């Protein structure tokens, strides 16, 4: 049956991910088998399952911040005022000529300073990102302690991962993913699924 195949597929996903991981997937066909497997069969209660299709909804962001089963919440740091009835689309203007550290980019969005806002021309100020290039420092000790990287591979690790978004806007779910990456500090493995 379809349910058996879906449950078996989700069981494979969840048995192959590292302890205390976050599994990020993109739609109901990926998510519901994982939820079923976890909630009904009790498989991997330490893993947090996150569906990016729902990350545009404030109720889901709030839910992801809280503990579920044995899994801690997702390390989102932006306050509700930055994702409730706002920031559905965030423009990117390349006005800074260097990659921004991801925490710096999220702090820019978090700021209420008018200098960190874009004026739409009618006096309405909106959040924006001042660059589409980002730097994500690698906490090597945490990456090893969490099992993301083996100790034997420490010398192969880079100090910083550079990201470039090939577009002029991000949506709310992408903003939240950047917030998570900026603040997870390599303490939890992050896995992505794709069908």
What are these regions, as identified by a protein language model?
Residues 1, 7-20, 37-195:
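ER/secretory pathway lumenal C-terminal domains and tails of membrane proteins involved
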Residues 32-36:
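Phosphate- and divalent-cation-binding pockets in alpha/beta enzyme and binding domains
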């Amino acid at each position: 049956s379809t349910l058996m195949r879906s449950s078996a597929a989700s069981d494979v996903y969840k048995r192959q991910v590292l302890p205390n991981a976050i599994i990020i997937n993109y739609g109901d066909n990926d998510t519901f088998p994982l939820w079923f497997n976890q909630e009904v069969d009790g498989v991997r209660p330490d893993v947090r399952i996150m569906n990016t299709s729902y990350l545009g909804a404030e109720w889901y962001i709030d839910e992801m911040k809280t503990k579920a089963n044995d899994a801690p919440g997702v390390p989102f740091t932006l306050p509700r005022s930055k994702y409730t009835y706002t920031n559905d689309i965030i423009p990117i203007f390349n006005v800074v000529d260097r990659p921004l550290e991801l925490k710096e980019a999220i702090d820019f969005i978090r700021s209420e300073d008018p200098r960190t806002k874009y004026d739409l021309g009618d006096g309405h100020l909106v959040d924006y990102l001042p660059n589409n290039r980002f730097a994500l420092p690698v906490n090597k000790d945490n990456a090893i302690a969490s099992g993301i990287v083996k100790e034997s591979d420490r010398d192969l690790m880079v100090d910083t991962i550079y990201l470039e978004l090939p577009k002029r806007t991000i949506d709310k779910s992408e903003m939240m993913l950047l917030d998570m990456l900026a603040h997870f500090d390599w303490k939890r493995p992050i896995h992505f699924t794709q069908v």
